[in-house]
Amino acid sequence: MMLDFKKKKELVTQINLIAKTALSIVVANPQGIKSNDITQLRKLARKSNVKLGVYRNTLLNLGIKNTPFECLKNILIGPTLIAYSSEHPGSAAKLLKNFSMSQSSNPNFKILGAVFEGKAISGSNINSLADIPTFNEALRRFIIIAKEISAGKLLRILVSIKNIKENS
């Protein structure tokens, strides 16, 4: 579909707004993906508050100019699907990582890379971004560790009391 100059300008403005509000952006190559699979990916994205978009590379390059995501220019080759979230930096990476694992029948779907805090992350190192725990996950881990430490201290105190009573 041919876009007129006005629509292209609106898209560049929209991409620039995305680049200013997103915590991280993940870029993937959607070539060869069936429309049913893309629809499924969009449903999963809505559930995890991740936004998806397919944009032309020239418009993306113009939209990310003078933003922390400018280092994406080296990654933008061929068809481009971007995923981003303004709530959690790892949610888009986690979504695309899980989707690429489920697409074992389609080897064409590849995560090209990502940008987090102004630094480019290659597609092979996307796990470092995808494994960042959410606030709730981190809180759960902290509580579990705190409980284990408390239980361990209590156990040591009880053992020392038992030893003191046995020795006296």
Curated annotation (Swiss-Prot):
Record-linked Pfam families: Ribosomal_L10
Which Gene Ontology molecular function entries are recorded, alphabetically? large ribosomal subunit rRNA binding
Q: Which InterPro entries does the annotation name?
A: Ribosomal_uL10 (IPR001790), Ribosomal_uL10-like_sf (IPR043141), Ribosomal_uL10_bac (IPR022973), Ribosomal_uL10_bac_type (IPR047865)
Of which family is this protein a member?
Answer: Belongs to the universal ribosomal protein uL10 family.
CDD domains membership: Ribosomal_L10 (cd05797)
What is the protein's name according to its record? Large ribosomal subunit protein uL10
**Keywords (A to Z) from UniProt:** Ribonucleoprotein, Ribosomal protein, RNA-binding, rRNA-binding
Organism of this sequence? Buchnera aphidicola subsp. Baizongia pistaciae (strain Bp)
Which GO terms fall under biological process for this protein?
translation
**Record's subunit section:** Part of the ribosomal stalk of the 50S ribosomal subunit. The N-terminus interacts with L11 and the large rRNA to form the base of the stalk. The C-terminus forms an elongated spine to which L12 dimers bind in a sequential fashion forming a multimeric L10(L12)X complex.
Q: Outline what the protein does.
A: Forms part of the ribosomal stalk, playing a central role in the interaction of the ribosome with GTP-bound translation factors.
| GO CC, alphabetical | ribonucleoprotein complex; ribosome
